[in-house]
């Protein structure tokens, strides 16, 4: 099993600042349509809504098809549970910290079908996935900043 967690500060000098609500709104947008947020994803469609906070979506990530069940835990966590596809497990996006020190944590625990746990092949996959997820974290924060700037420009 692959376990990875990474945390980045939400607000950095020289970039537009985001509030906890703006980060939450961005995570909800990402859960519903990840394409503007995740460079390695080429397809994302919500396929079934179980409630206001739980829904399923199909995605193509790195050329492979997955079905994920999304759980929104307002105002701090979105959980993506892979329920079908060649890599199963859980991915969590969590907002942490005080208002003046917001952080976004991405964690995943994944099992690659047909790959022995602890093997060199699993480690190679883990390293590749970690790189993709670090890019996704940065792209997610950048997309949230763009959205916030657009909303600020409209309301100004």
Sequence positions of predicted segments:
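Glycine-rich portal/gate segments that line the openings of hydrophobic small-molecule binding cavities
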Residues: 46-84
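Short, Lys/Arg-rich flexible segments
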Residues: 16-18, 35, 131, 138, ...
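Hydrophobic residues positioned within well-ordered beta-strands of beta-sheet architectures
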Residues: 4-6, 55-57, 68, 91, ...
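Beta-strand/loop substructures that line and gate deep hydrophobic ligand-binding cavities in soluble
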Residues: 83-135
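Beta-strand elements of well-folded, non-transmembrane domains
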Residues: 10-12, 30, 61-63, 110-114
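Short, highly charged C-terminal tails/helix-capping segments
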Residues: 43-44, 141-156
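Hydrophobic ligand-binding cavity/cleft-lining segments
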Residues: 1-45
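Hydrophobic/aromatic beta-strand elements that line small-molecule binding cavities or substrate pockets
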Residues: 8, 43-46, 67-71, 89-97
């Amino acid at each position: 099993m692959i376990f990875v967690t990474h945390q980045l500060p939400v607000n950095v000098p020289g970039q537009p600042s985001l509030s906890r609500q703006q980060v939450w709104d961005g995570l909800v947008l990402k859960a519903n349509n990840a394409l503007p947020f995740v460079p390695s994803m080429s397809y994302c469609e919500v396929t079934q809504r179980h409630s206001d906070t739980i829904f399923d979506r199909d995605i193509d990530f790195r050329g492979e098809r997955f079905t994920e069940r999304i759980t929104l835990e307002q105002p701090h966590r979105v959980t993506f549970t892979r329920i079908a596809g060649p890599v199963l497990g859980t991915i969590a996006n969590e907002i942490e910290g005080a208002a003046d020190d917001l952080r976004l944590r991405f964690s995943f625990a994944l099992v690659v079908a047909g790959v022995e746990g602890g093997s060199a092949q699993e480690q190679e996959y883990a390293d590749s996935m970690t790189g993709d997820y670090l890019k996704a974290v940065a792209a997610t924060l950048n997309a949230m900043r763009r959205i916030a700037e657009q909303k600020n420009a409209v309301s100004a």
